[in-house]
């Protein structure tokens, strides 16, 4: 689209070589220069916070020797997905520092982008599964048995990882490195074999990975909020509220954060599709979509490092688990000893 490097750093991996006859628009060089300077540092910051934060979350969930409840199973899988995702971000930071000249070879071009694409699906499907579980607990409590729900949660998580991996296969197959003589770089790009792939990709990206899950999330959380309002009088009589209410508050916050981070990305991805099929034209739209995709993409990336912060500041039960883990890992204080016994120990210690 633009005369800048034909690489849109998106988890949808929709970057392509521009057509030979594409109009070269260069109306925002200062903005691109700023992005090239700022984005690598921003990516590394996301990677650092996301790596430490999600490792911390996994340790809190997995170190105590006890069975995870259903919500914790889903949240642990979400943290694992975010952890795998942020491990690929340093490659993109180096790619931007290198003026979009991909230095890591064709295999890593495919693997890193495949991981990013899989994370997009795994994350949104896990958010749907979490919302559905809260819906069953609060709206249909009699129909949900804890043991059965735990088994279903494990199976659901396995299926989500498998489906996310399968949906990333086209990215793994179609991503490659290719020389771009006009820019004097070798870019990691997505090569779509036919124009029909543009439509198939936008259906996969905007409908399967966002609109359908969004409809499910809205349905489940609408009924969750209605159920919580119906229990408001009961919860007032309980000190601090029920355990289910605390867990639900955490999950609702995670859902809102996910939608805020990812909605702009899908909006600009749809605009990019409209530009590809020439439904919108002109240098204004080209620059607007190019820059918007870059910014929206990295707003989406922040979600992977934001979730651990939400656990700490919103998840009261999570903070309780952190404190319990701290006490478990901290050596217990020694029993007090008499002064005479202490004197005897010192004499034995200093004896030559």
From Swiss-Prot:
Cellular compartment(s): Cell membrane
SUPFAM superfamilies: Family A G protein-coupled receptor-like (SSF81321)
Disulfide bridges in this chain: 109-188
GO MF annotations, alphabetized: bradykinin receptor activity
Membrane topology: Multi-pass membrane protein
Keywords: Cell membrane, Disulfide bond, G-protein coupled receptor, Glycoprotein, Lipoprotein, Membrane, Palmitate, Receptor, Transducer, Transmembrane, Transmembrane helix
Cytoplasmic side: 63-72, 132-153, 228-250, 316-352
Protein name per the record: B1 bradykinin receptor
Protein species of origin: Macaca mulatta
